[in-house]
Amino acid sequence: MVASRETLQDIAAERQLQPATLERVIRLIDILDAFGADTLIGPQIALKGGTALNVFHSDLDRLSVDIDVNYVGAIEKEQMDADRPGLEDRIERLMESKGYAARREPSEHAGGKWIYRYASALGGAGTIEIDINYLYRGPLYGVDRMPSAAIGSYQAKNVPVLDIHEIVAGKMVALITRRTARDLFDAHRIIAMPSLDWAKIKAATLMIGASAKSFDWRSASPAAIGCEVGDITGKLTMCLHDRYFDVFGGPPAWIENVTAECREKLAPLFQFTAGETAFLDGVLDRGDVDASSLDVPENVRSSIEASPALRWKAQNVKAWKSGDKSLAPRTRRAGRPRGETR
């Protein structure tokens, strides 16, 4: 599924999008369709992040151009270790069969990243990143098989996607810990989505936030929500329709209005009950994963306590407390974002 220059230009003109970004999304849809149809890859992964949100749970509000997936084949580390080489080899061979050239980034315990290069129909070359995370291999609310949004005649079918509440939770953690324009854009779209169960989102946010690398989720605050204007012009504008920010009065006005709205609507996520604070204290102060103080269903509590990501974080905390600085980086607490006045 490779769109021609003429097709890209026609769709881009119709949707007021940049042709090069549009081409990446069409290629991404083609790759995800192949992943979902593959009998080895499909059952072992679940799409998450901005692509899951914008390509599967909205009508391409923002063009997301990378593939972020969790391995979900098994929660047991031994089975994951056994599955990993075959899964990664199958992905590499599938991508090669579609004409992509890979550059593998250094592998880590938590996952691996590939940057795939392709010859663009518009001339020159483009890239697509595929990132596999192996720590979040226990989905909190399950995995759904879904079709993507359609771009002209291009659409993925039957793609494994994380439950929307866990996708949103990941976005909420990214909103605080990364503070990028794309996360702010996605958060603003999320607060307008109907029928979300915010109790489920908060539980997942606590799990993911407590697992965050080098961040103390107890310090998470609506005050950290926002982004820099340069991040919009450098990274977000290319993923939106032409002149998107004009109706808001320009990027600075958009940031001001959207930040205020998100801070107000999302504030309850950062108002921790005594039980939630006890859970976070256990993980971040003592390296104990005990979700008994959380007001969640028993199956969710069990899934949180079994989370490999949380257990890895707890192991690092214990190592740090014992004086072994090799495993755990110092955890930072959220402060006032740079460039923001009191």
What are these regions (language model features)?
Residues 1-45, 55-61, 65-67, 71-342:
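Structured mid-to-C-terminal alpha-helical surface segments
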Residues 50:
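Active-site glycine-centered loops adjacent to acidic/histidine catalytic or metal-binding residues
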